[in-house]
Design a protein with these regions (language model features):
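Active-site-proximal, substrate-binding regions of enzyme catalytic domains
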Residues: 2, 10-307, 311-317, 326-352
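Conserved SAM-binding loop
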Residues: 321
Length: 352
């Protein structure tokens, strides 16, 4: 009986298509290996299979990056059609309202062998910048706002606006360079993002530090680290004099959630960036290029920002999110976003 609706992230989708091609896969989660045949059976017996527009953009880009051609993307595109027809599975693409993959345009151009590669890469780039910018600003602002509140300082709202504009301009410069040079690796992009985060943070702290001193407080000096590592070390140093500083930051985040809920921000979006904030403060985890992609995937079920290609409304309670990426899996599990323990337990072999 076809009764499951499954949302595949990028690597789960590629895993499925390669399995169809009978390639060898060795993927594991929580030290348990994925049972390929069970995963394949679940997908071919699903009611609906979903992927997001950003998965298509990512596969399109990887095809260009590896071969300078769309052949690999075309293969996966053809595999979707074959899979649908072979198993009578409904296969739909979830598109963010501002990040839709223009599938009809691609199909028309593909038939004529005239795919405008630059157009699709630019669409991916623009949307990616928007998502990474959103994460950077939210994480950076949550930290700066907390520090201002912690030391009794009032921040003007125009301060946020200016920082947001600067961040977007610099991110565009970084992404233009990355997507113009096929030799550049994700590690280069990630380093540039961390440097940008550090730039924003330094400017924000330089803005509030004089006011902290005016209020009679001493701001901790942190040396030899920058970016998210600086943030983690700063909080660890604050903890020496205030054992509850991490707890206070968590309470600050809860206050932001309440404020953003009133503004209509979706719950999945908030869960993702709050987890990102906490990982940054608690462990110094960096914001990376792929976080923008992950962010768009995990928030794609929010009805206010999604366009789906199905005829009926999608009940998110009936959807299972499948990912074999450790970070995304942990997010889905920890935050209970489209997570099914029973489904994953069925997919995996016993612990090694």
């Amino acid at each position: 009986m076809k009764n499951k609706n499954i949302l595949l992230d990028t690597n789960a989708f590629i895993f499925l298509m390669r399995n169809e091609k009978e390639s060898s896969n060795t993927i594991s989660l929580e030290n348990r290996q994925i049972n390929e045949s069970k995963f394949y059976d679940e997908c071919k017996n699903a009611n609906y299979l979903f992927i997001t527009s950003q998965t298509l953009y990512e596969i399109f880009w990887q095809s260009i990056k590896k071969t300078k051609k769309i052949d690999q993307f075309a293969y996966y595109y053809d595999q979707i059609i074959k899979f649908k027809n072979k198993y009578n599975v409904k296969f739909s693409i979830l598109n963010d309202t501002d990040g839709e993959f223009e599938l009809r345009l691609f199909e028309d151009q593909y038939k004529d062998n005239k795919v405008d590669i630059n157009h699709f890469i630019e669409r991916k780039r623009e949307y990616e910048v928007k998502k990474i910018n959103e994460l950077l600003i939210k994480v950076c602002f949550s930290i700066t706002e907390f520090l201002a509140e912690y030391y009794g300082i009032l921040l003007l709202r125009n301060f946020y606006y200016v920082a947001g504009v600067i961040c977007e301009i610099k991110l565009n410069e970084i992404s233009y360079k990355y997507y113009s040079d096929l030799k550049l690796k994700n590690e280069w992009y990630d380093k540039e993002i961390d440097d940008l985060f550090n730039f924003l943070l330094e400017n924000m702290i330089s803005y509030i530090e004089p006011q902290i001193k005016e209020n009679g407080h001493k701001f901790p000096k942190i040396q030899n680290v920058k970016g998210t590592k600086y943030v983690h070390k700063l909080f660890c140093k604050l903890k020496k004099d205030d054992k509850t500083v991490f707890e206070k930051y968590d309470n600050h985040l809860k206050g932001l959630v309440e404020e953003l809920e009133k503004m209509g921000m979706s719950k999945n979006c908030m869960k993702y960036w709050i987890r990102m904030c906490r990982r940054c403060v608690y462990s110094g985890a960096k914001i990376k290029k792929n976080d923008g992609l992950d962010y768009s995937i995990v928030t794609c079920m929010d009805e206010s920002i999604v366009i789906n290609k199905t005829n009926n409304m999608i009940n998110t309670n009936d959807i299972i999110f499948v990912t074999f990426d450790t970070n995304l899996y942990n997010f889905s599990k920890e935050c209970d976003v489209l997570y099914s323990k029973k489904f994953y337990d069925n997919l995996m072999f016993e612990y090694r």
